[in-house]
UniProtKB/Swiss-Prot annotation:
Identification of the protein by name: Probable CCR4-associated factor 1 homolog 2
Necessary cofactors: a divalent metal cation
Enzyme class: hydrolase
Pfam families reported in the protein's UniProt record: CAF1
Entry's family note: Belongs to the CAF1 family.
Designated gene of the protein: CAF1-2
Subunit structure: Component of the CCR4-NOT complex, at least composed of CRR4 and CAF1 proteins.
Length: 286
């Protein structure tokens, strides 16, 4: 039996609000009430891993183009086959302050979805073992979790998506947005990467990927945990749970802005690490 995970740091000022089917409407109402004052949205997902890789037959002679097209084809194949398990959202203002939702604590959200069934659905074994070790109860998700279609309906009306005043903050986020786009559109991901980015620009007009931003920062390297450590950001909650990861993403982004960037970051928006937006690369956006 694996040992129960230990949060890296307890913080009595933070409440990770667990969202299940019974309280979905209530929690989405709180998010809708908060979004205007806290327009930075950090997002992370947990999903059943990567179960296949594709072989590209694209004759494109540009090896750089082949690289991101292959990455998208692999992402698309996996997202279309698999089901989202958990999604974390952290809302903040530009200084990193979080909503309190009428309590004496700062609130972040962790949505637990019901669709994935470990008995009948495909998954990567190492990913599921890691999620179990991170205290994600897949059976409880199955029984009590959020209905993904209802979540998508509520998110569409919340002001969080389709809103160019919202700044999405993520880390190496192609799969995160792939799963969210599949939920919001109710369809499989589009065949072509250019159509994927058309959907991205519609639903999430402003997106910052920390992994992409690292390329403009000195002496930053590694994954999210390492970057957070280098910037002096400590985790609250359990690693590999989406709520905790979304908060770590938000706080790391705030520190990066403070240390490495001045003024607007909009020129860095829309680039996802490993899935370079062909419209931005050719200067054809808008």
């Amino acid at each position: 039996m694996s040992q129960a995970p230990n949060p890296e740091e307890e913080d009595d000022t933070i409440e990770i609000r667990e969202v299940w089917n019974h309280n979905l409407e209530q929690e989405m109402a709180l998010i809708e009430q908060s979004i205007d004052d806290f327009p930075y949205v950090a997002m992370d997902t947990e999903f059943p891993g990567i179960v296949c890789k594709t072989v590209t037959a694209n004759p494109n002679p540009n090896p750089y183009s082949i690289h991101y097209e292959y990455n998208y084809d692999t992402l698309k194949a996996n997202v279309n086959m698999l089901k989202l398990i958990q999604l974390g959202l952290t809302l903040s203002d530009e200084k990193g302050n979080l909503p309190t939702c009428g309590t004496n604590k700062q609130c972040i959200w962790q949505f637990n979805f019901r669709e994935f069934n470990v008995i009948s659905d495909m998954f990567a074994l190492d990913s599921i073992e890691l999620l179990r070790k991170s205290a994600i109860d897949l059976e409880k998700n199955n029984e009590c979790g959020v209905d993904a279609k209802r979540f998508a309906e509520l998110l569409m009306g919340s002001g969080v998506v389709l809103n160019d005043k919202i700044h999405w903050v993520t880390f190496h986020c192609g799969y995160d947005f792939g799963y969210l786009l599949k939920l919001l559109s109710g369809k499989e991901l589009p065949e072509e990467i250019s159509d994927f980015f058309d959907q991205m620009e519609k639903f999430f007009p402003v997106v910052y990927d920390i992994k992409y931003l690292m390329g403009f920062c000195t002496n930053l390297y590694g994954g999210l945990e390492k970057i957070a450590e280098l910037l002096g950001v400590k985790r609250v909650g359990i690693s590999h749970q989406a709520g905790s990861d979304s908060l770590l993403t938000l706080r790391t982004f705030i520190k990066m802005k403070e240390f490495f960037f001045t003024g607007s970051l909009l020129k860095y928006s829309g680039f996802l690490f490993g899935l370079d937006n062909p419209r931005l690369l050719t200067g054809s956006k808008n």
